[in-house]
């Protein structure tokens, strides 16, 4: 799978996992992250700016951690561990390593 598609999948998985914990507020917080555009919340469709997509995911993780603490960061990492296991180390956003 192409890196841009993988990173988008990671972002959606993080948002949906946070939504399972905190409800629709997860989408509201994701909207505040620069470089991430919510296309269709119900379908789970987003768009990441291709340049800096890894950094956008780092900002998304930081947004949740800032509000909900370290446990929120771990929820993000756990949500995508199967995806990042298949990626090259230099492709993985630093917040998920």
Regions of interest found by a model, annotated:
Residues 1-97:
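Long, compositionally biased intrinsically disordered regulatory segments in eukaryotic proteins
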């Amino acid at each position: 799978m192409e890196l841009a598609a993988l990173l988008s999948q990671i972002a959606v998985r993080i948002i949906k996992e946070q939504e399972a914990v905190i409800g629709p507020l997860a989408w509201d917080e994701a909207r505040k992250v620069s470089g991430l555009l919510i296309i269709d919340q119900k379908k789970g469709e987003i768009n990441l700016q291709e340049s800096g997509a890894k950094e956008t995911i780092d900002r998304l993780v930081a947004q949740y951690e800032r509000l909900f603490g370290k446990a929120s960061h771990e929820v993000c990492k756990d949500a995508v561990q199967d995806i990042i296991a298949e990626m090259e180390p230099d492709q993985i956003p630093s917040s998920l390593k």
